[in-house]
Regions:
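Acidic, low-complexity terminal tails and accessory targeting/binding regions
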Residues: 2, 76-89, 144-155, 167-241
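Active-site metal-binding loops of divalent metal-dependent hydrolases
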Residues: 12, 162, 212-214
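A structural signal for well-ordered alpha-helical segments within the folded catalytic domains
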Residues: 30, 50-54, 124, 128, ...
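Short glycine-rich phosphate-binding loop at a beta-alpha junction
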Residues: 42-48, 146, 155-158
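Phosphate-handling substructures
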Residues: 64-137
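Alpha/beta-hydrolase fold catalytic core
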Residues: 131-150
C-alpha cells in the first residue's frame, strides 16, 4: 500500500441490552478475522463500548497486536429534538429532514433542526479526536486538506459504530453527515476503506475506495444483518421506526 489507509469497521450484530454481540455477531467477527489478517493493520483502535471491543478482539486475535481504546470512537451521542423527544440523528424520517437545504451543506449544524441540541458539540468532539489521531500518524488537518508532516504507508483499523463512522467520513471530506446517516448503510462488520492521495508534495486528501464492504460474509454464506436498515416497502414485516 502506497498511502495511509484507514479501515473503518462496524461492530458485529449487536445485543444492545448487554452491549455485546449476538451469536450471529460473534460469527460475523470471526469471519472478519480472516480478512483482517490479510489486511494486516499496523495500528488497531476501538470504541470503548463492549460490542465494538468484542468485535475488535475476535477480528484481530491472530495478529497479536495491542488494541487501543479511544473514547471518541464510541457511538455518536448527538441528539436532535427537544424535551422527552430527543433521539439519534440518523433515524429521521425523509420528509422531516430533506426539506432543510442547509442540512446538505458543510454548515449543516446551523440548520433549525440542530439549534438548541448537543449535535455540533458532539460532532466537534469526534472531529478533534480524529484530527489528533491523524496528526500522530503524520497528517495534519488544515481547512479542507491535510498537510503531510510524515508521509507513511500505515494501515489503521478503527472498530466503531455506524453513527460515528458517518461523522468520521463527513469530517474527512468536509461535507454534511446527514446524507451519510440517512442514505448509506454500513452493515455489521462492514469495512470502509479510505486512503490518502498526495498528488502534490506535502498536501493530501482522503478518498473512499469502498464503503460498507461485507464480502467476507457473502464468501461464507453468512446472511447480512438488517441492523441500521428500515423496511424496503411499507407493507414489509421489517423495521419501520
Amino acid at each position: 500500500m502506497v498511502c495511509l489507509q484507514l479501515l473503518i469497521i462496524r461492530h458485529g450484530d449487536p445485543d444492545y441490552i448487554k452491549d455485546s454481540l449476538t451469536k450471529k455477531g460473534k460469527r460475523e467477527a470471526l469471519l472478519l478475522c480472516k480478512r483482517i489478517e490479510k489486511l494486516n493493520p499496523d495500528f488497531i483502535y476501538s470504541s470503548p463500548l463492549g460490542r465494538a471491543k468484542k468485535t475488535a478482539k475476535l477480528a484481530t486475535k491472530t495478529l497479536g497486536r495491542e488494541i487501543t481504546v479511544l473514547p471518541w470512537l464510541r457511538e455518536f451521542e448527538g441528539r436532535v429534538g427537544s424535551g422527552l423527544f430527543k433521539d439519534i440523528c440518523w433515524d429521521r424520517l425523509p420528509e422531516d429532514w430533506t426539506r432543510f437545504d442547509g442540512l446538505y451543506t458543510d454548515e449543516w449544524y446551523d440548520c433549525a433542526m440542530m439549534k438548541g441540541t448537543n449535535v455540533r458539540e458532539e460532532y466537534q468532539k469526534v472531529a478533534r479526536g480524529l484530527d489528533e489521531l491523524l496528526s500522530k500518524h503524520g497528517y495534519q488537518h488544515s481547512g479542507r486538506i491535510f498537510k503531510v508532516t510524515e508521509p507513511n504507508h500505515d494501515t489503521i483499523a478503527l472498530f466503531c459504530h455506524f453513527g460515528v463512522e458517518c461523522v468520521i467520513l463527513s469530517h474527512l471530506l468536509s461535507v454534511s453527515p446527514m446524507p451519510f446517516w440517512h442514505n448509506f448503510a454500513a452493515l455489521t462488520t462492514s469495512v470502509t476503506t479510505v486512503v490518502t492521495e498526495e498528488r502534490r508534495k506535502g498536501i493530501a486528501a482522503f478518498r473512499i475506495l469502498s464503503f460498507g464492504d461485507i464480502s467476507h460474509l457473502y464468501a461464507n454464506n453468512e446472511e447480512p444483518s438488517f441492523a441500521c436498515r428500515f423496511c424496503e416497502c411499507f407493507d414489509d414485516d421489517t423495521r419501520h421506526d
